[in-house]
Structures are given as C-alpha cells and as structure tokens.
Amino acid sequence: NKFMSEDSVITEVGSTKRNLIKFTKNKNLILSHPIAGSEVSGPNFGSKDLFNNKWCILINKGKKSKINTVKKFWKNLGSKVILMNAKEHDKIFAITSHLPHLIAYNLIKTAQDYQKVEKKNIIKFSAGGLRDFSRTAASNEIMWRDIFFSNKDNMINSINKFIKNLNLIKKKIKANKDKE
C-alpha cells in the first residue's frame, strides 16, 4: 500500500468483529474491543483512567508483531488484554453486552407505552432497577441498532434463549410456584 508503511499499525474499537475479519488480510489491521465506557460518548466524557483495570479484547488475527504492538498500547492505558477469535467474541458479547442493551431499550419502551395508555407518569416512581435500565437505554440508539444488525445471528440466538427463560419464569408465576 503506497499510503502506509510496512511498520504501520491500524486498530479499531468496534463492538462486533466477524464482519471485519475480511479486512484483516491487511496484516497491519488488528481488531480491538476495549470493554470500558458509559452511556455517553465523545471527548467531553473521556477520563484518564477510563481503561484502568478494564478488559480489552484483541482478535487473534494478523501479524504477531502487530498484535503485540496493539497489546502493549492497551496495557499502557491500563487495560487487561486477552486474545480470542472473532466468532467467540461476537457470541460472548451478544449475551453480555448487546442483549442487555436490547432489553433496556425494550423495557423503557414498555414503560413509556404504559404511561401513554394509562396517562400516568410512572417513571417518577422508578427506583434503582428501572433507573439502571434507563441509563443503559440512554446510549446512542442508532449505534446500538447497527451493533444488533452486525451481530444478527448471535443476537437472534440470545433473544431466543432469553425468551425461553422468560417464558419459564412466566409459567412459574402463573402456577404460583417458586421451584420445580
């Protein structure tokens, strides 16, 4: 590539990886996912210790020397670094990150719909539980929609597992049993 020297290293910080693997033919590209941040983004919300003691996932694809350079970069920012493959990454984060955001958006929408129908401000009565979900749901909807779509198969599997467990709980509540 005439625009980049052989010594160059490129990394990215997206939430899904399988769709990006095709770009790792460029051996200078190393896929990263720092597990840090909050519902707000941008330079005004940064902090010097944002990555301290937080995990950063590196996708184990590319030149070992480039992976080591990116690994050192994240460690210098205070991160704990682990390597994994893209398929495993996307499967794990569908459950641990993407599904919780989807649930938060859905729960807040359910509360808003209830308010509209009942014409009562129920949100003001929410304690920590709903407030925590509303904080998560305050994240950028467009960004999360794109994350859901880019991890579609894992999201559908995660949603199906969640619905299955939710239906089991619903069945127990209907039967008024706490254990089977």
Residue ranges: model-predicted function:
Residues 119-180:
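Interdomain hinge/lid region at the active-site interface
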Residues 1-44:
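Rossmann-like NAD(P)(H) cofactor-binding subdomain of soluble oxidoreductases
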Residues 19, 65, 157:
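Residues that form or flank phosphate/diphosphate-binding pockets in enzymes
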Residues 15-17, 35-36, 62, 88, ...:
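Glycine-rich beta-alpha junction loops
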Residues 44-50, 143-146:
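Short, flexible, solvent-exposed loop/turn segments with mixed acidic/basic and small polar residues
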Residues 48-135:
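Internal alpha-helical scaffold of NAD(P)-dependent oxidoreductase catalytic cores
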